[in-house]
Amino acid sequence: VRGVLYKMSDASKDTVVEISGKLVEDCSEIRALCLRTQDFLSAVMASGKLSEAQADRTTDMIFIVDNLDRITEHLKDINENVNAIQQSDIKYSNTAAEDLNKYTLKLIDMYETSIIGLVGDVGVDRKKLELTRSELFELRAKMFRAHTKRVQKGKCDASLTAPFGSLLQDLETIASGCMDIADQVEEQHTIEIDLSSDSDEQ
């Protein structure tokens, strides 16, 4: 997921079609991996070898993977959106592209802040997350108002309003997903699961 966000932020006017097309494929692969991970964790739950605490933590992990899957689904939608529009006769403006890049960079910061607890003992900085999310809400509103002004002045085609609005909604949903992950990461650091056979006790 982090790699997809970084590649999105690196895309230029000349490379956006190629990169977005590749990222659609990458997102499909990530979602398939999420599904396999969920299946594995569900099988662990069904093994009957978890303590109550371990079962709770595994449930949290399943929830986190589900959120990663939903985030990836919206990333795929965004890249399909951008790929289709930028290959059409009517394209997003350079200003819109720059604003989308700013939003993506903030999403990277938010995602990394929310997920950091999964790879270490560092706590999640909730204050930073809430501040970034607030900034993203404001940026989304600013971007949409700027788009409508461009339409009003004839600098942007009105037919782009719906896909641009959908794109912004996908971005905001990803931000919400990051907050959901952070909620679980605060409770989920290390899972110790004993999957050994019970045969030694027999």
Task: List where the protein language model places each region.
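Cytosolic, long alpha-helical scaffolding segments
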Residues: 1-202
